[in-house]
Amino acid sequence: MQTIPDALFGIIGYPVSHSVSPAMQNAAFKHCKLNYLYLTIAAKPEDLQNVIASMRPLNIRGLNVTIPHKIEVIKYIDTLDPAAKKIGAVNTIVNENGQMKGYNTDFGGFVRLLEHNRIAPAKHRFALLGAGGSAHAISLAICTLGGHLTVLARQEEKAKDLAAKMCLRFKGKAQGLELNEANLEETLAESDIIVNCTPIGMGNLAGQSLISPRLLRPDLTVIDAIYNPCKTRLLEDAEKKGAKIINGLEMLVWQGAMSFEIWTSQKAPFRVMMKEAEMALDENEK
């Protein structure tokens, strides 16, 4: 017999049906004997304000925030954790007695991914594709740890704005360029790590890549923040060229574990969450 959950949580984004977050968070709740439920909430940009407002009457205890809402959502929450304020993007919300507080765990998730793969940013030059919410957190992680960063985005102004924010804190460590073939070719020739923070390669954009295979080479490390599919077109092309490839699943689970700890004040069962996320991803790809 099912019981009514003591608290509701969820992930808001568009699209969001591909997410493995419900599987891993619900597994974590069960492991920790918490009678909580985590749901997916598909919300187009025009519906974002209403969904956040509904957290109060529906007593939704917390949310994860994903593409494309991580920056826009800041308008609709009451307070920001200092890290989220510094990053300028939110991926975790807590409903504290009707007050919405925003956090960012993408930063920590990416740092853990770098540590696990023994990547010391200070020794590398990064090409970062995209200038959205995840890119804000990842760019700050790269620059904080001493890496040199080039941000490439289709809207040149967004790339330059993000790079300028990094340069205010880390002089000379970042530049922003329009994402086009010429700039990609020049930037990748000088970079040894590529990070894709765009949705190109997932959902309706699966099978697509922003980078021509001819620009890839064996000495590159290619990181795709996308985890579903497990291997995007970019990662497949990079692997064929002999490059090291890393998908976004590990980062997802680390940031999800940090969100769990913010919501529950309990230590997250990381291994349980990783196993469940891998199983859910395998099921999604069948």
From Swiss-Prot:
InterPro entries: Aminoacid_DH-like_N_sf (IPR046346), NAD(P)-bd_dom_sf (IPR036291), SDH_C (IPR041121), Shikimate_DH (IPR011342), Shikimate_DH-bd_N (IPR013708), Shikimate_DH_fam (IPR022893). The keyword Chloroplast does not apply. It catalyses: shikimate + NADP(+) = 3-dehydroshikimate + NADPH + H(+). Pathway: Metabolic intermediate biosynthesis; chorismate biosynthesis; chorismate from D-erythrose 4-phosphate and phosphoenolpyruvate: step 4/7. The keyword tRNA-binding does not apply. Pfam families: SDH_C (PF18317), Shikimate_dh_N (PF08501). PANTHER family: BIFUNCTIONAL 3-DEHYDROQUINATE DEHYDRATASE_SHIKIMATE DEHYDROGENASE, CHLOROPLASTIC, SHIKIMATE DEHYDROGENASE. GO terms for biological process: amino acid biosynthetic process; aromatic amino acid family biosynthetic process; chorismate biosynthetic process; shikimate metabolic process. It comes from the Bacteria. NADP(+) binds at G130, A131, G132, G133, S134, A225, G248. The active site is at K70. Belongs to the shikimate dehydrogenase family. It is an enzyme of class 1 (oxidoreductase). Homodimer. This is Shikimate dehydrogenase (NADP(+)). Involved in the biosynthesis of the chorismate, which leads to the biosynthesis of aromatic amino acids. Catalyzes the reversible NADPH linked reduction of 3-dehydroshikimate (DHSA) to yield shikimate (SA). GO terms for molecular function: NADP binding; shikimate 3-dehydrogenase (NADP+) activity. Shikimate binds at S19, V20, S21, T66, N91, D106, Y227. The gene is aroE. Its EC number is 1.1.1.25. Keywords: Amino-acid biosynthesis, Aromatic amino acid biosynthesis, NADP, Oxidoreductase.
